[in-house]
Amino acid sequence: MASSNLLLEVQFLHIPSLSQKQANPLSCRKFSSLDWKQEIGLKKDVFFRCHGLLSSVCIDNVNDHAERSSEFHHYGVGTNLRARVKPMKQFGLSSDGPITENDEETNNEILHNLCSNGKLTDACKLVEVMARHNQVPHFPSCSNLVRGLARIDQLDKAMCILRVMVMSGGVPDTITYNMIIGNLCKKGHIRTALVLLEDMSLSGSPPDVITYNTVIRCMFDYGNAEQAIRFWKDQLQNGCPPFMITYTVLVELVCRYCGSARAIEVLEDMAVEGCYPDIVTYNSLVNYNCRRGNLEEVASVIQHILSHGLELNTVTYNTLLHSLCSHEYWDEVEEILNIMYQTSYCPTVITYNILINGLCKARLLSRAIDFFYQMLEQKCLPDIVTYNTVLGAMSKEGMVDDAIELLGLLKNTCCPPGLITYNSVIDGLAKKGLMKKALELYHQMLDAGIFPDDITRRSLIYGFCRANLVEEAGQVLKETSNRGNGIRGSTYRLVIQGLCKKKEIEMAIEVVEIMLTGGCKPDETIYTAIVKGVEEMGMGSEAVQLQKKLKQWKLLKEV
């Protein structure tokens, strides 16, 4: 549609099956949903006097002849109801037909069955017929119909049925309204959504947190930050409860789109309206700025928190520590920790994990281990994340003996080692060429019922190749293939080239076969390495013959 105003209009056209004599003379009039505010307060008898206006609502312009020509009793209507429905020929719901002879209860039972069977177009037609003949449609069925139409993106029909429901005295629930408002916001029809939001309160179904959050997010998505701020301020002035979740969402979005300074201004403005921020609201600002490294903005927010008599909590401290560790501001980290010890918010296991992880990433393993022991002194039990971080860092730094010792202690704690734990230590041992210890740990892992993954096997294979134990690497590849596990092509290449260098051509060819059966296509370098290995074994004629075969099979290019 050309604009959001056009969306607000519902065209009332002649129903295709009606003759000119049957059609209501007012049926071509347009009726805007902007007029809802005047209509919602009308009594039901006034609504019934308006039936001429609703006489020929064209709910569906889609070519759905099959659906329109269906009979009501085909949609699961009970035997008693069929008896009450007058006998009829094949007819469409776009015509009143004998339906006018049905009472309200009968038509509502038909409406319920149509909605239950997903016949939304027929249900829309029936609601229109009932409205034209002063029959009040079943409100729960209308709500379900509106939701169904909203799900299939038929907003014009959904809003039309919603209007009929409201003018009949029904009160749609908040979920129904929210579905329509959500779809309107997705399409960028903010004005229409705001009109519908205002109508919610007038109809006795006030907006909730989801309603407000949806509208505010939509405004920001379309670059209307100031409109969103004014909107929430107006809602507070009109008596809307100061929903803290909505307030937090608003402030975080203002911070994201307009900066911290504007967000703090909004905090001050909303406080005048009786909406006061809590530490959760402030934490959203701290978190946003920390993630972007805006430490000056963070300092400004912290100062604002303290100046208003609020205390930082554990979430605030942990967020600050995570940011400071990532920037390697270790003096500031120590300062924050000292403050935490002096308050009621002592460091938790999450706090220590942040510190240990940051120090390990900065390759300050000794300080990380100091914090690990400090953690134990404070009676703060490490979890598996703590152990995995320390063991991973030890293995990378070559402290494999210490890692094995810590791993042994871990078995007797409430945090038994897992796959990640074993992989870290096995990889460290393999990189140092300590394959005997790596294999021992590998078998311990299997005995504990922990199955290796591609990382485990790749660490072993690379370790064997570095230690010039290519045959053992080939055996691991065979075991992997027998279990149906995948291996990277680079791993196969490393083993094949290592076998060729050691003139283990038969085993190299066997690994190639494993590679092919595993669905991994070798490249030309692998075949070249095999030919070269055969030649170096003193079998020149065999190498030439093999090369010809490979070229014939188009596995090697002609030079």
Swiss-Prot record:
Coiled coil: none annotated. Transmembrane segments: none annotated. Pfam families: PPR, PPR_1, PPR_2. It comes from the Eukaryota. PROSITE patterns: PPR. PPR repeats lie at residues 103-137, 138-172, 173-207, 208-242, 243-277, 278-312, 313-347, 348-382, 383-417, 418-452, 453-487, 488-522, 523-557. Keywords: Repeat. Belongs to the PPR family. P subfamily. NCBIfam families: PPR (TIGR00756). This is Pentatricopeptide repeat-containing protein At1g08610. It comes from Arabidopsis thaliana (Mouse-ear cress).
